[in-house]
Every structure is written in C-alpha cells, then in structure tokens.
C-alpha cells in the first residue's frame, strides 16, 4: 500500500507499507514491511528506512539474532565504519546488501562479502495492486 509522499530536506520521499517475507537460515517469517525511499540526484530510488514487523513473534528469534538487531540501531553510527550505507544506516560488520526490483515484488538481499554466492538474509516485499 502506497502511504503517500512528502518533502523533507528538499527531496521527495515516499512511504510504502506492504506484506513481506524475511528468509534466514532456511526459515521464513511473514510480516509487515515499512519502506521509505527518496531519489538520489541521478534519479535512482534509495531506501532510507526499512522496518520489518513479524506477524508471528515466536519465529522472530530464530530468524534475526540479537546482534543483527543491535547492529541496525540508528544510534550506533560511526563515520569510519565501512559496513554502513551512504545514509549512515549501519549493517552488521562485513555484510553488504543489494535491492532487486520486479513489477509486483522487490527484494533486499544481504550477501556475505567473502562469498557473494552466499545469501545471509533476504527480505521479499510483495506489492499489492491498488483496489478501489
């Protein structure tokens, strides 16, 4: 569900709330995903906010370790760390990410930088068509 756009700091920002599936270690947990985006000076969309809330809280502990949650704490910004993106969003040490987009879904994929064929986590966000 597109939750609308607003302007902040001179850039247009969009917000999307959707259903998502977080995969990690062979386990899948469904939940609600909130995504905030803006366009960089080149016109490419940039994800600046990504939040996943599981619908089954018992499964969360098996998919997301406490270290992963702590590493994503916005208060832990360090200018010299290489494991943060341009918006200073902090990822666990050594983890990189990519966004894969299709018409009805897009994915955020975290890969092991030492072995890029190894996917550490994958968040699939399902877009629903607008129903009037």
Swiss-Prot record:
Pfam families linked: DUF1609 (PF07753)
Task: Name the family.
Answer: Belongs to the UPF0329 family.
This protein's name = UPF0329 protein ECU07_0050/ECU09_2020
**What species is given as this protein's source?**
Encephalitozoon cuniculi (strain GB-M1)
